[in-house]
Amino acid sequence: MDHFFIKRKRNSEVKYTEACSSSSVESGIVNSDNIEKNTDSNLQTSTSFEPHFKKKKVSARRYNEDYLKYGFIKCEKPFENDRPQCVICNNILANESLKPSKLKRHLETQHAELIDKPLEYFQRKKKDIKLSTQFLSCSTAVSEKALLSSYLVAYRVAKEKIANTAAEKIILPACLDMVRTIFDDKSADKLKTIPNDNTVSLRICTIAEHLETMLITRLQSGIDFAIQLDESTDIGSCTTLLVYVRYAWQDDFLEDFLCFLNLTSHLSGLDIFTELERRIVGQYKLNWKNCKGITSDGTATMTGKHSRVIKKLLEVTNNGAVWNHCFIHREGLASREIPQNLMEVLKNAVKVVNFIKGSSLNSRLLETFCSEIGTNHTHLLYHTKIRWLSQGKILSRVYELRNEIHFFLIEKKSHLASIFEDDTWVTKLAYLTDIFSILNELSLKLQGKNSDVFQHVERIQGFRKTLLLWQVRLKSNRPSYYMFPRFLQHIEENIINENILKEIKLEILLHLTSLSQTFNHFFPEEKFETLRENSWVKDPFAFRHPESIIELNLVPEEENELLQLSSSYTLKNDYETLSLSAFWMKVKEDFPLLSRKSVLLLLPFTTTSLCELGFSILTQLKTKERNGLNCAAVMRVALSSCVPDWNELMNRQAHPS
């Protein structure tokens, strides 16, 4: 049948045939056979090389307000092109349906009973749809804002360490009163959508879980970390173990609250280690080999012959961690050595405080008396044997109010009044006030966050040298007492017998000598040998010359890195502006060996001051009225240095109360 049809050549085939024909003419070969061959070959090649045809671009249709008479409005959802939405069934059609014929067909087939409805009818339907859309979006926004507000209030309550019921009984009612007064009742009603009642506790637990997950995720990445731990007994007679962690993260060290453990069984080293193992390895899935430092006090619970918690922890770290005895605890132990005569003065001062503070009537009478004569202070401070270094403040208050206390004791006919009539006793009290204030100041310098071992060692060594200097001053022919301002003022304002003053000077000299010996015992020089060998960590730019670097016992690669680092003026500027830990974290890419060695030296804690702070907050939270409170979640939120990711928390479904 093919011979009955006339086949037309494609344009490309015609052009190709003409080209072949012209080439044949130019070559002088013109015959029908060549033309047929060329044509056949052209047909074969044309089947394998199809020409490219451009598709016709279809433009998107736009919505027209006249389409409302067919019952369609423009859909408010964020589509790429305009799409019609039926005001009756709310169906959304494709962009291609934006034709009057297709829209009319939808109305006739789906809603035939509404064909004769006037335009006003569809306008009312359009208005109803817009109102419902606005209501839903507004309700969603209010619900999300209410949920976020609930989280923020719970976070603030936990950070301020106040009772959870304060949010429901004080904060929310107060906010309602303020908004209702300043704005109107309608605005105040929006606050009622904020979840309340018992929701604050649930929100705090959720935030605590979120913060814990954030911290553990970081530690599970295999980074090095160090811990400090301490145990104490709260008001509910529950033994509590607090653990803090310091880890290298991004461009510096971070310190955070790791865990809060209740030790329910009898307190022993095995109990503490078992609970730690269960939490750190069992629950958190952390590797003890990444622990590079352990810091605790020197109590028998931690380091005793039978418990040996520290020994067990060092074993599970394969001795890859170092143990540091808390500097503050060691200073407190060293400060307890006092000669007998000075100890008697201290005991009598404590008796005076207990006589007045032990009776509410005596305390009120002294307060009234001090207020009437206009003293700067009206109360005495309690003496606690555990907080040994707080005696600086206690003795300072007694010495400041010595005349008022003397008059009060005479009125009370107490035998303790006679000690204030003894100039020798008052002079010794002035010295004890000064020396304990100095020790208390040293203790405060050893506390705080982000302190390194070099700073603490420098302060301890500086104090030991100061003690030696004071001894030399007192041994001279013309002794100087400038270092004890209250003592110096007292002997200048009062006539003190020269022989008595010499006796007091000998007792002071004996006390300073005893302090030097105890500080040398608790802070031996051999413990600081590692720091002296790695003094380049403290100041790497002090070793610019090769001769000084050779004496540091570094491997050749480390020597080369230190020489290159100390020659960089740009890094010297960073060293002067950044903290020591931040500086070594910054150069870890360029000087990995030195950075790694420095981080391992700086990472361990030097004190357990963070644990002490945690116990103070625990005392604030767990009052006598709330002695059965489980403070784990609140402690996490109150002490964590991580900031919650509110967007992640908001992804949880809101359930307004």
From Swiss-Prot:
InterPro entries in the record: RNaseH-like_sf
Species annotation: Homo sapiens (Human)
Similarity comment: Belongs to the FAM200 family.
Stated name of the protein: Protein FAM200B
